[in-house]
């Protein structure tokens, strides 16, 4: 759960945090008894607790398909991310990965920690995949094939232009959006709109660009070789080499570059909102909406923040818990996007080279949210000043003592 100091500063986080903790514990206790499914869900909890919690919203059949889809793509991503694998060995694996998912004898040892376990015991994922309905299998195979080919292409070339950046993000994340839409269709839960491919792609690009921005330092410090996803067309305006952005003497230029990257990501929000409006199934809606809200929140935190080049920048755990707890309808999504766009807007320096473009995109988002006519009576994500009075702090400490005693007893 969050630290005691943070919870005392943000007491409104406590109840959602407790609910999230109990939900995680419940999900961990519901591991299927079959060895292959047990491995898949246990691994899902290890590689992404937040995703494993959100996926619980789905019905069993669709949940199983999405779980396998996620782990297959995580395994593919593990191969791509392992910079110790020689290119002439990595590229054929990426290109052929969609065939390996049918082979319960196949595995390839790479990655570290839980990802190495995933790769070493990939036969469990293959066994689960082979139990899915044909429609799910075909969707997963197609997306894995296209993604592997795209990853292989960018192993051999750098991200030079913004078009390259969009193409790379399409391969590694936009295709995830398309694949999920195909799984929803195969489940009979959703009807695809005429522009479903474009807006599904935008859902993936918005999440991926947020991750690429947030993970700059981790990627640039990767050993034995840096991972570089920021397009030269953007960073080349501010530095001679991408790694120069992490040095303190370049902070002003680095932050300007960061702000342009965030501004680029904002262009996908209109499509994301359009996609979420089209969803009919409440569980699928929550599954899709929660990560999108966390992405706009992360961008608001990263914007104009030099800490992106110094360490880890992420939403506090209590705010994540609030997003999971509160996101139930499209009105909640509009409220969250409005709040976080307002937060981001207050951080825009009018002397920033891209200030005008940033403000225009934020104002367009705010107008979309206002025009929906559902912003009244919402609980704000950003107006909490985090300054509880001393009496309240004492009450919270007593409450926490009782809660922790209860949790230990159970």
Swiss-Prot record:
Catalytic activity: 2 (2E,6E)-farnesyl diphosphate + NADPH + H(+) = squalene + 2 diphosphate + NADP(+); 2 (2E,6E)-farnesyl diphosphate + NADH + H(+) = squalene + 2 diphosphate + NAD(+)
Named cofactor requirement(s): Mg(2+); Mn(2+)
Transmembrane segments: 283-303, 387-407
Cellular localisation: Endoplasmic reticulum membrane
Pathway listed: Terpene metabolism; lanosterol biosynthesis; lanosterol from farnesyl diphosphate: step 1/3
Enzyme class (EC, first level): transferase
GO process terms (BP): farnesyl diphosphate metabolic process; isoprenoid biosynthetic process; sterol biosynthetic process
Keywords: Acetylation, Endoplasmic reticulum, Isoprene biosynthesis, Magnesium, Membrane, Multifunctional enzyme, NADP, Transferase, Transmembrane, Transmembrane helix
InterPro entries: Isoprenoid_synthase_dom_sf, Squ/phyt_synthse, Squal_synth-like, Squalene/phytoene_synthase_CS, Trans_IPPS_euk-type, Trans_IPPS_HH
Assigned EC number: 2.5.1.21
Membrane disposition: Multi-pass membrane protein
GO molecular function, one term: squalene synthase [NAD(P)H] activity
The organism's place on the tree of life at top rank: Eukaryota
Pfam families: SQS_PSY (PF00494)
Modified residues (N-acetylglycine): 2
Main location per the UniProt record: endoplasmic reticulum
Keyword DNA-binding found: no
Tissues where the protein occurs: Expressed in all tissues analyzed (seedlings, cotyledons, inflorescences, siliques, leaves, stems and roots). Highly expressed in roots and pollen.
GO cellular component: endoplasmic reticulum; endoplasmic reticulum membrane; plasma membrane
Protein family per UniProt: Belongs to the phytoene/squalene synthase family.
NCBIfam families for the chain: squal_synth
Name of the protein in its database record: Squalene synthase 1
UniProt organism field: Arabidopsis thaliana (Mouse-ear cress)
This protein's encoding gene: SQS1
């Amino acid at each position: 759960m969050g630290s005691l100091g943070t919870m005392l500063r943000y007491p409104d986080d406590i109840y959602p945090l407790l609910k999230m903790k109990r939900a995680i514990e419940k999900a961990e206790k519901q591991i299927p008894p079959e060895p292959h499914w047990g491995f898949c869900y246990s691994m899902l909890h290890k590689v992404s607790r937040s995703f494993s919690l959100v996926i619980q919203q789905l019905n069993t059949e669709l949940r199983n398909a999405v779980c396998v889809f996620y782990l297959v793509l995580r395994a593919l991503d593990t191969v791509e991310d392992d910079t110790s694998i020689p290119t002439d060995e990595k590229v054929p694996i990426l290109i052929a990965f969609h065939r390996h998912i049918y082979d319960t004898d196949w595995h390839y040892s790479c990655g570290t920690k839980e990802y190495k376990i995933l790769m070493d015991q990939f036969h469990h994922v293959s066994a689960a995949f082979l139990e899915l309905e044909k429609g799910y299998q075909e969707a997963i195979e197609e997306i894995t094939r296209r993604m592997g080919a795209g990853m292989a292409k960018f192993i051999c070339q750098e991200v030079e232009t913004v078009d390259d950046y969009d193409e790379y993000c399409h391969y590694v994340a936009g295709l995830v959006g398309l694949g999920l839409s195909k799984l929803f269709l195969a489940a009979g839960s959703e009807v695809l709109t005429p522009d479903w491919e474009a807006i599904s792609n935008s859902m993936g690009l918005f999440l991926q660009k947020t991750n690429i921005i947030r993970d700059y330092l981790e990627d640039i410090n990767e050993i034995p070789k840096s991972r570089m996803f920021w397009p030269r067309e953007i960073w080349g305006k501010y530095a001679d080499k991408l790694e120069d952005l992490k040095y303190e003497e370049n902070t002003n230029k680095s932050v300007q570059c960061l702000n342009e990257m965030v501004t680029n990501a904002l262009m996908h929000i209109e499509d994301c909102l359009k996609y979420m409006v089209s969803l009919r199934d409440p569980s699928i809606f929550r599954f899709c909406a929660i990560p999108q809200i966390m992405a706009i929140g992360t961008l608001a935190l990263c914007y104009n923040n030099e800490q992106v080049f110094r360490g880890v920048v992420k939403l506090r755990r209590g705010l994540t818990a609030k997003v999971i707890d509160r996101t139930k309808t499209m009105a909640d999504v509009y409220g969250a996007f409005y709040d976080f766009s307002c937060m981001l807007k207050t951080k825009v320096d009018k002397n920033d080279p891209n200030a005008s473009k940033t403000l225009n995109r934020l104002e367009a988002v705010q107008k979309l949210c206002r025009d929906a006519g559902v912003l009244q009576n919402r609980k704000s994500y950003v107006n909490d000043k985090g300054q509880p009075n001393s009496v309240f702090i004492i009450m919270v400490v007593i409450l926490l003592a009782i809660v922790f005693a209860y949790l230990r007893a159970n």
